[in-house]
Amino acid sequence: TDRHERFFLRLISKNTLLYTEMVVDEAINRGDKKKLLEFNINEKPVALQLGGSSPKLLAEATKVGEDFGYDEINLNLGCPSKKVEKNRFGACLMKEPNLVADCLSKMQSVTKLPVTIKTRIGYDDVEDYENLHSFISTLKATGVKTFIIHARKAMLGKFTPKQNLNIPPLKYEYVYKLKKDFPNEEIIINGGIISVDEIKPHLEKTDGVMIGRA
């Protein structure tokens, strides 16, 4: 979802919140900020998705994102790739809820924008609902109000990113239950949803739908 695709998507939908590709915090803090973050005003509303695990570096990147005019800052806790795991961000951070909470607290302390998260229902052999509930509870305590849940677990180091988009079974019921258990939070469902007809039933049980592939 680079700026060119987002411009095209905005022509199709005038109101949908669009997201950037995941951008690593250090790339923003040390790299060409304009090249990485500049976007056309017509793309708005648009969220900047960050990858990282350092509260300090994520906070710095969050502030840069706010200064560039983004409408939301999203922390990626769902990417399962080996490269991402090696650098300690993405889905592997589901193993470290307290670190994630520290990151989110620091990010929120430097911005007035909403800070949100995108994650999965579990990882490897950890896929029980109780663990997901505990993870979300820990993050909720920081003040985060919006949780985007890919209704598959992440198989870390075992599947390719493409396989992780298809092989782990979808468990939409986990996301529905999260909404029941966290009625005051915004719970958005993601995973395997590719048409408007498929969206409608999910909207009866969650607050929104994210489409990554269609």
Give the positions of each predicted feature.
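Flavin-dependent oxidoreductase catalytic cores
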Residues: 1-214
